[in-house]
């Protein structure tokens, strides 16, 4: 049932938890001294991920990447193990419906049209049936450039917007920032199309948060198992769907895991994983804003409140 967790979702979440424990211990991330052995945690992560990958027949990788983010295909699709249940026709407070597309859409003052195909061109569709975007969630230009041009996931970052008749309205360019054109000067960075709803009810949409996808579990297994035959199999399945070739054979455990981590970054971008990935890999200090005060330990855990420590002196 959409919006509710089943046994497979529980197994998938356990796989994620054990992977985070393992990698946090292995990387020396603050706060994980209590974890006894990283290898034991990796083994448990692989075990629970394998239960999801091999022990059920409901979920699998959707061979069509576009379907994964098609708002009207998700509820009966095969990729999403656990996600929210938003409804564009719901009334009341936000939470029964979502405004996620607005967070990503550029603010042109008109309805934004994008290609209905990840390949670009052809028929166009509304990003959402509403005129205003918030431009809050922005794609970093340098991040987009880390994707191979053959990677279909690169097309999930919009670089061209259209008029309703299908003609090109504007193309992204960093130099657009200084343009006198009121559309172009909003389109100086690409924007993510993982959250669209062409049939939205004004700003009320059915766009969901993707809490656990089958692809994540495949990559969890690969990272936990390391460069085994099955580890290679699952990371390469995700890469194949994205239009890419297999990882090189013969990688060391460290190099293989790093390759899988880079795959996770590209596969799960804009789905709420970023800060947690930085924390578990002990890399939060690599991504802070350099002209702002930064306390490394606070990027991982806030200090325990003094009142709670006073009430629990043995903890």
Q: What do the PLM-derived regions correspond to, one by one?
A:
Residues 70-119, 201-211, 225, 230, ...:
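Long, intrinsically disordered, low-complexity segments
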Residues 2-5, 36, 202-209:
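Short, solvent-exposed segments of well-ordered alpha helices
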Residues 4-174:
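An aromatic- and glycine-enriched ligand-binding surface/loop that stacks and positions planar moieties
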Residues 17-21, 48-59, 220-227, 234-241, ...:
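Structured segments of extracytoplasmic/periplasmic soluble domains
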Residues 140-240:
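C-terminal substrate/ligand-recognition segments
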Residues 38, 42-45, 231, 235, ...:
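Amphipathic alpha-helical segments in well-structured domains
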Residues 63-65, 86, 158, 221, ...:
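Active-site proximal loops enriched in glycine and acidic residues that flank catalytic Cys/His/Asp
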